[in-house]
Amino acid sequence: MAYTNLNPEKALIWRITHRRNLPWILVNGLHAGNSTARSPDWVTIGNQELINRRAHRAVPLPPGGMLNDYVPFYFTPFSPMLYNIYTGRGGVARVANADIVILVSSLHRVVELGLPYVFTDRHAYTMTANYYNDPINLNAIDWPLLQQRNFQRDPNDPEKVERYQAEALVHGQMPIEALLGAVCYTPQVQQELQEQAARLGVQLDIHSIPQWYF
């Protein structure tokens, strides 16, 4: 199955978070890893070692800084990190699918709002990553690979997994109005999140799409 909605015309970008973080995000937006704005009850998911290492990788284009000065997104919802969180692969702490929310925006929406950003053609932490800050370069991303939802290692294409993890990086903070929606695992979680958004007076499309999970 080809996920043809993953393309440069839409330039959809995706980020996962723990569902317990969503009420805070709905009020405060998304913040970079180095931000002092953080919920005291924030639940961190993913590879903590890699998160820490990103504090020391410089971004070579304006607005510059380090990777943890940015809110990172992938150009696919089907990320290796989501798989690792589900399976515990690589020593990553496991989190149940029902506790993971996939947030969606678009690089075009980021541009429309005038938010500072860069994007890469592969995992941003790699030394071979190429950086861009103009949507005209979106074709540098391997969209056919993303559409295949296939990040298995291939000895004939050793950089495949890195290209699959191309990133969009929004500098500093991303307001809630930059989000296009959110995806969760079950209708029960969907109802819970919709009620949270309604109580906070936030309009956000929230859908239950279990087939997007591993």
Please state what every model-predicted region is.
Residues M1-F75, S79-F214:
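Active-site-proximal loop/hinge segments that shape catalytic or ion-binding/gating pockets
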